[in-house]
Structures are given as C-alpha cells and as structure tokens.
C-alpha cells in the first residue's frame, strides 16, 4: 500500500513541475550599457499580445523607474576649473586705480614698465633717460643713476609728498630749478654726485644727507647760509668740487663733513667753534675731511679746540 502511495505522489509532483511555465531571465550585458532603457526587452511582454501599444506605454512609464533605481546614477556635475590667477595691471585712470601705472614717459610708456617699481621704490638706473620720468604718487625712493638727464625742472617732483630719497648719480645735470626740491615735505636724502652742477638750489629743511660730490661748484655755487636751517642734517659731502671756503654756518646736528679735493686755502677760528665761548664742545661733528686742499691746518689750531677729533688734512 505504501509503495502505491509513494508512486502516486511522485507522479503528481512530476506533473506539477512540468506544468510550471519556463520564462527567460534578463541578464546584464555590456552591449546594452549605452542603449536607452526604453529599448531593453521586458520579460513580461508577449509578441502575441493584442494590446501592444498599451503595454509599451506601461513599460515606458512604470518599469524604467525600477530599472533606473538599479542601474542609473546621479548625473555627474563638472566642478568649474579654477583659472590660474594672473596679476592684473591696475588702470590708474579709473576711480579705483592706485595711480601706479598712470604716469607715462615721453615715449608713451608707463614709468613702471620702462623702469622697475618695487612697492614704493622706483629704479630707473641705466635706462638712457634724458629727463626725470613721471613718478607714481606713492613713490618714496627714486633712483635714476647712470642716465643722460641734463635738467631738473620745477615740477619733476611736484606733489610727491612721500618722497624720502632722490639719487641722480652720474647724469649730465647742469641746471636745477630753484624750487625743484624745496617743496618736498619728507625728503631726507639727496644724492646728486657725479654731475655738472654749478649752482645748488634751495633745499628743504628735512634733509639728513646731502651728497653733491664731483660737480662744478665754485665760490658762488653755494649761497650764504645755505645749510643754516637744515637742523636735521647729519652728513654733508661736497668732495671734488672747486670750493675755496667752508660753507657756513653749519648746523649743530652735522656729524660728517667731507670737503676733500677742493680749493680751500684758509680756515677761520670760528669755522667750527665759538671763540667767545671756550666751554663750547661740538660733540656731534666727529668726521671732517679736508685732505686734498691747499691749506695748512696747523696754522689755525684754535679752530679745532671744540671738536672731539681733529680734521683730516695737511699739517705742513
């Protein structure tokens, strides 16, 4: 009996399994990677279905949403590439411009392209310039050495209220306007050596250093009391000129006076000291150079009594 039952159950299970419909499964194929989802074959679509249009509509609306969740990814967003930062030239003619590139030379070039501008310093050395170029208003230090500048005009340094140093070494300067430097409120150092200057103009009282060596200054080249009101002056260099006297009076602040290689022939006892005040000591003036002049310093010993050091020069 048990054998009959087992045979019956086995036959029933075999028939049930054979009755289950076999369906094709959809597997991922790289060929369909670039095909739109709407073109993929759907397992439930029958070629013999009379309502194919309706089925295609349902496939295009409902089914792809499921497939998209499995295979599609969020669209890639390209991050904007950072452009390389390039220094921009500021047009000083605009309201926001700093004025650095506004001044132009006679050739029509901005000064800071012809010369070298580093911060508030302008270097125009050895540029074959025949005139002082227009300078940015914030210029503090100006160097124009080894050029061909012949004349300093009244307005060459006009409105440069921050200018502290001017160096015009080794040019061909023979003429300087009387007011070329006088109105510079912060000028500290003026270097005019190795030129052809015959007359020293009026100078601002703020100067601490003056170098007019190797020029053509004679008896009338420096006016009387030219340095009297320069109360901050510390260094005065007038070597290699044609002076026949020491320019007086000299400010009390003076520390170094170089007058080598001139034509100074005499020295007064009150040139450096106060003959009526034997207690007077001129402590600041420690460096006096008179060598290269036709003068015998030993003839005027009382002229140096107030000095901390004797001048350098001929004693015979």
Curated annotation (Swiss-Prot):
Residues 1-23 form the signal peptide. GO terms for biological process: articular cartilage development; bone development. InterPro entries: Leu-rich_rpt (IPR001611), Leu-rich_rpt_typical-subtyp (IPR003591), LRR_dom_sf (IPR032675), LRRNT (IPR000372), Mimecan/Epiphycan/Opticin (IPR043547). Keywords: Disulfide bond, Extracellular matrix, Glycoprotein, Leucine-rich repeat, Proteoglycan, Repeat, Secreted, Signal. It is found in: Secreted, Extracellular space, Extracellular matrix. May have a role in bone formation and also in establishing the ordered structure of cartilage through matrix organization. PANTHER family: EPIPHYCAN, EPIPHYCAN-RELATED. This is Epiphycan.
């Amino acid at each position: 009996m048990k054998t009959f039952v087992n045979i019956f159950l086995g036959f029933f299970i075999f028939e049930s399994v054979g009755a289950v419909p076999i369906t094709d499964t959809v597997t991922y194929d790289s060929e369909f990677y670039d095909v739109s989802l709407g073109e993929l074959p759907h397992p439930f679509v029958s070629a013999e279905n009379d309502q194919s249009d309706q089925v295609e509509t349902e496939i295009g609306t409902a089914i792809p949403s499921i497939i998209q969740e499995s295979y599609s990814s969020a669209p890639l967003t390209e991050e904007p590439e950072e452009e390389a930062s390039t220094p921009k030239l500021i047009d000083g003619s605009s309201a926001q411009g700093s004025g650095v590139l506004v001044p132009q030379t006679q050739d029509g070039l901005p000064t800071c392209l012809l010369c070298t501008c580093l911060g508030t310093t302008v270097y125009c050395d050895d540029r074959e310039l025949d005139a002082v170029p227009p300078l940015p208003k914030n210029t503090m230090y100006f160097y124009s050495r080894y050029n061909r500048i012949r004349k300093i005009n009244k307005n060459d340094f006009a409105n440069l209220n921050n200018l502290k140093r001017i160096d015009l070494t080794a040019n061909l300067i023979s003429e300087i306007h009387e007011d070329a430097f006088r109105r510079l409120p912060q000028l500290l150092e003026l270097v005019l050596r190795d030129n052809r200057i015959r007359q020293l103009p009026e100078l601002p009282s703020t100067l601490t250093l003056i170098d007019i060596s190797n020029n053509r200054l004679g008896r009338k080249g420096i006016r009387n009391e030219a340095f009297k009101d320069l109360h901050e002056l510390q260094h005065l260099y007038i070597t290699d000129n044609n002076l026949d006297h020491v320019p007086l009076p000299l400010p009390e602040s003076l520390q170094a006076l170089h007058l080598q290689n001139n034509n100074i022939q005499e020295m007064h006892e009150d040139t450096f000291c106060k003959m009526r005040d034997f207690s007077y000591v001129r402590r600041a003036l420690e460096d006096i150079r008179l060598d290269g002049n036709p003068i015998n310093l030993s003839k005027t010993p009382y002229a140096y009594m107030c000095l901390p050091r004797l001048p350098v020069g001929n004693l015979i």
